[in-house]
Amino acid sequence: MVELNNCSNSEENGCVDSLEVRFTDFCKNGLSMGESFVTEATKLFNDSKHLLLSNNSTIGVITEGVERYWFVFVLYSVKRLSEKEVGNSSNGNEGNAFSLCQILRGAKLNVVDFFKELPQFILKVGPTLSNLYGSDWEKRLEAKELQTNFVHLSLLSKYYKRAYQELFLASGNNEDKPSATSSSAIHLPQYYRFGWLLFLSLRIHVFSRFKDLVTCTNGLVSVLAILIIHVPVRFRNFNINDSSRFVKKGDKVDLLASLGKIYQTSIDDLRETMDKVNYLITEKLKKKPCLASEFRTENLDNLDTDGLTYFEDLMEESCLPSSVSILEKDYSDAIQNKGELDERIFVNEEDSLLGSGSLSGGVVNMNGVKRKFDAMASPAKTVTSTLSPYRSPNCANSKMTVATPVSTAMTTARWLRTVIAPLQPKPSAELERFLSSCDRDVTADVIRRAQIILEAIFPSSGPAEHCAAGGSLQSTSLMDNIWAEQRTSEALKLYYRVLQTMCTAESQILNGNNLTSLLTNERFHRCMLACSAELVLATHKTVTMLFPAVLERTGITAFDLSKVIESFIRHEESLPRELRRHLNSLEERLLESMVWEKGSSMYNSLAVAKPSLAAEINRTGLLAEPMPSLDAIAMHINLSSGSLPPLPSLHKNNLAPNGQIGDIRSPKKVCSEYRSVLVERNSFTSPVKDRFLALNNIKSKFPPPALQSAFASPTRPNPGGGGETCAETAINVFFGKIVKLAAVRINGMIERLQLSQQIRETVYCLFQKILSQRTSLFFNRHIDQIILCSFYGVAKRTGADHVDIITFYNEMFIPSVKPLLVELAPAGNAEKNNHNDGQGPASPKPSPFPKLPDMSPKKVSAVHNVYVSPLRASKMDALISHSSKSYYACVGESTHAYQSPSKDLDVINNRLNGNRKLRGALNFDVDAGLVSDSIVANSLYLQNGNCRSPVAHVKTEQPES
């Protein structure tokens, strides 16, 4: 710990120099880095260390933990952003061949902590990185992509482990073969590890850029098929003749159809991926493929072998270690110079590098881990949401009945596969009728536009991009093209489908088929295409194209997209709940911050609707640039040869008035950018946030205005009459949405703080007046900042007690509590001493925070048929047994495809009220009609593995943070 407040100027310089000494020592001695790399890393460290030192202003100390985090962030940034071509280790890069995991081990930090704090480092050091590495540093750093990839791999590793344990035993079950039991300690880890390494090899050599969750799940299921075919039968944990679980083809089992049924994968996709896995085994492991139909072995008994490939000796005990070693070396060589995460840590159960945190639906939830950069934290919200535990009826009879984030994604992908994929990739006859009924036939324009825009969103690979396997494997370019073509087709069909429904609805509103002003509007069609593409990306949960990529590649702004989201949801009735939630989350994110950013087209409409604001809007340069033409986008696609970068300067402000990088320095950046990693690909939220429910309830009462006025020229009179211009109408609708969103958040704050109804109404009225009369306060800000300031201002004005938090903090709290805060700082040293001398960090210290029971202290009435409980998804599977599952409905889950949980409540009511055979006499006395707290608490504590009586500790359910 360095106490800078006790240093004089000369001493402070010594303290600063000691930081550099420790950093250099960490690089050279801790990680054995090369001299050139250390020089470059030291340059970034020296240019950014003033930001680290500035955080001591309140407490006056820098903990060793914060220092080590800064070391790691600097090294990771330099590794990713270095302009040097990193090739073979023989080219002078002997000291630079290290991965992110090696850096973390050297600093004795874990991955979860790293990702939790990384956004704060980027927020602070962004301008420095831009000066050193150019304006495209953020794209090259790929921090969001790396974090999303980590989330996906965490989910996939758990999915794989659960599936493996369901399919295979820890030891052989044939007692006639004693060697099975004696070697079980070798077989299970080796088979399990072999499968994961084979999957990682598939990701490296086949999946390339597009490592989306659905494609990777297909790869894992293909690996499971390889294991089923080759792992000795004595290790199986299933009966191949189990007709309720496996699909029969004649008198034998169709393996791929069975796996497709159990894991909700497309059989065609599974078959294609299986071919790639087989080719990978042939090329990398040098195994000779044989037609399974021509091979006789116990593993293939009762299997339909048509189309299956068998590799002799692939899983034999004598050959397996060699195969594992080959895959290990191949993976090590592939990631050696990339500075990426070593994805083998997910099957190293003894490896504590993953940390004590847990992943729930893409959100890093820390269990008792204190933020190291509290002093650096931004006012952005921490968003937590769990993935919808949707259960497919197709899996009701299988052992995979417990829904997971992965199975939820596969269920939503099934909607694309079964509802959208069968459609024609061209306008239907009904849609063509609308297109041809315009003042001129716009069918050809619509088709051409869709082709160009979707190619910009889903670019094909250039011919020069090939796999790093020396050409032995199928080129990565071809695989990328196949993926892009499939996603383009899905988005195109969805676009035509929703466009037709919208045209039908608009024609009914306008009492005519002539929709010229709408169907000839370029911005409207691009918004529809962007919305369709975003849903396809969200369904597959891609890593490389996170929102707002669709905005950048289509040339539209957040304000444009916000106009169509509600209509899109209304006009696609088959849209799964998970995708509806995704669009709701996007709309909220657009309204709360992105629409107010510099370069938003909202300012163009606002300048017309409110001329008094035009001067301020022009002075601050908030107006949007002209939307790039289709020809410009098409030319950009052709010039880029498939590797399409974002169109230059469409939405991102390059320099703020103070000369800093405005896009990074904005106080809302963490919320709008890094929140995307946790939200937009994690759109399968469950339960639905209260604000979404309330906002949707408000929306449902007011039908949306005709889309023609929403996308008309701002200065054009509104065709609906009323004397308004289209800009005034659009701004009024937009302001209405802002007010409704603010009302939901104000109400939530009031409930949490237990404030009066009068305060709620006063804050709400103040917010409305600020929006209408002081609109410029919202410019380039997050609406939560206005809401919080409104709360504080109202509290000051109404004379509430103890509200001057700023004065209290500066003048009373810190002078009194500073010694106590300083005492907390040595935790960094204690943490260091807690580590062993081994490679990874030691086990985390138990949290002093008490474990709160997941229950409400209220009595549970036996009179009511359905008890609505704030049951956490994390406790659902443990609490609900297979025998009682049919009597529960969990928010965000349904037992019927694409249906709401409310319908499940009706089903449960009917089941409870139906004719049932009572096995014994029931006591309906009043006293017996209530289930006591102790009974409920004991049941919960037993599930948690805690047998202590919790009666004295029953507390109200706390929301997950």
From Swiss-Prot:
GO terms assigned for molecular function: RNA polymerase II transcription regulatory region sequence-specific DNA binding
InterPro entries given in the database record: Cyclin-like_sf, RB_A, RB_B, RB_fam, RB_N
Cellular localization per UniProt: Nucleus
Ranges where the record places region Spacer: 607-728
Region (Pocket): 404-819
SUPFAM superfamilies: Cyclin-like
Major location category of this protein: nucleus
Sequence segments annotated as region (Domain B): 729-819
Region (Domain A): 404-606
Highest taxon listed in the record's lineage: Eukaryota
Role description: Regulator of biological processes that recruits a histone deacetylase to control gene transcription. May play a role in the entry into mitosis, negatively regulating the cell proliferation. Formation of stable complexes with geminiviridae replication-associated proteins may create a cellular environment which favors viral DNA replication.
Protein name: Retinoblastoma-related protein 1
Lineage: Eukaryota, Viridiplantae, Streptophyta, Embryophyta, Tracheophyta
